[in-house]
Amino acid sequence: MASILTLDGLYAEVPKFLPEALREGCAGKKPLSFYIQQILNLMGCDGNEYHVLFTSSSEEANTHMIMAVVRRHLLRTQQRPHVIIGAAEPPSVTECVKALAQEKRCVYTIIPLKNFEIDPVAVYDAIQSNTCLACISGTNAVVKTFNKLQEISKVLGAIPLHSEMSDVVYQGCIKQHPPADSFSLNSLYGFLGVGVLGIKKKAMQGLGPLIFGGGLRGGSPNVPGIHAMYKTLTQQRPSIKKINTVHKLFMKILKKHQHVYLPIEGMSSNGMPSNGMPSSGIPVEGPKSLPGYILFSVGRSAEELQKKIFTKFNVKVGRIVNLQEVLFRIKIPQKYWETLLFIQLREDLTKEDIKRVMAILMYLDTVTPRGSLPPPSYSSSFS
């Protein structure tokens, strides 16, 4: 899957089957109920059955769900709650459950993969009298095979099943593999975007006060949902010094990993055309002004992506470089490609944008060219 993502968070090119508003990133321009209904339509869920809660990411959504269910169980009984998780769950699920277990707030069972998927029979065999939640994603994080969520939900009975569904949605398979009791999504409405936690109302009983305090349905300054994210992205501006730091580190990484660096004639940091920037793919040390854009294009649709980007931003086209083979050669996992696809070096980068980019670049600076990326992190040297 190829994506074009701008770091101002206001535009995104993602799979065509997604609704127009999700593709164009119109965050904050309509009432919150509009976006809630969009998510329900995207997932094929009935608005009378599901609550939709916007979060900063699917990682936050997963953590909220796990923490809330465990706490609800502890409020109801003295027995330590038991959580079932799949062997190929995302780190946000496994690390949260393991941390709770270390605090002696729960116990857990890991279901191994059988024929590259989670076997419903194995889930049934793992059920205990104190089982309060099962976390089985729509796809397995390692091999990207689909799990039979509806069958797993049936064997669980009244025990809620929480599923990370981002890969299922982005592969266009949500109709064939719908969620069960609750689901999480990531990176909607732009580069940083927002996450979603969807919960069936029958599973929501007693969870509302444990999620966002009162079970809020949208975002707030402390819970960056649609409107809060939009406000943050449009108001925060980093200094040009930080942008230059990112650029220098980017150049260093590109040379080390033998990527093709593409300075494209466009807008410099002061908003004027960046004269003197070469149109070749040869790295240049110490440019007089920042390039308007650095573009990485993955897959077959480079020309289409080129047209969309430069029509949108009125930037003169230089040359598009397809780096699919390069990405394979240095073994960057596909799920991190979008982080590297499109980096816009202009004054409208936000602090969070820079932190995300810097976390990736600083890691790449410490590994050999055959290394792979860690999970995205927002920690960096920038405060």
From Swiss-Prot:
Keywords: Late protein, Pyridoxal phosphate, Virion. It comes from the Viruses. It is found in: Virion. Pyridoxal 5'-phosphate binds at S58, E59, S184, L185, N186. This is NifS-like protein. Its cofactor is pyridoxal 5'-phosphate. One of its GO terms (cellular component) is virion component. It holds the Pfam family Aminotran_5. The keyword Iron-sulfur does not apply. Signal peptide: none annotated. It comes from African swine fever virus (isolate Pig/Kenya/KEN-50/1950) (ASFV). Induction: Expressed in the late phase of the viral replicative cycle. The keyword Nuclease does not apply. Belongs to the class-V pyridoxal-phosphate-dependent aminotransferase family. NifS/IscS subfamily.
